[in-house]
């Protein structure tokens, strides 16, 4: 598998409100239940390197945010 491209390497993981980058293409979202209530998880794929990301939007968890989910 190829490495993360430079813009993907620059994404701060697991931090609320950290920005993505311009070449991420949204691929839909889903709801999941957490102890504090439902959260929205949005899936993205990088146009440049093909990395699949998810962004978890949880207002009560500062450490929810970007994570790599596949290639």
Residues covered by each model-derived region:
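A short, surface-exposed interaction/processing loop segment used at functional sites
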Residues: 62-71
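Short, structured interface segments that constitute the first stable element of a domain
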Residues: 1-2, 42
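Short recognition patches in nucleic-acid-associated and regulatory proteins
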Residues: 2-37
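Short metal-binding segments enriched for Cys and/or His
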Residues: 33-62
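Small disulfide-bonded, cysteine-rich extracellular recognition modules and tandem repeats
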Residues: 8-11, 56, 69
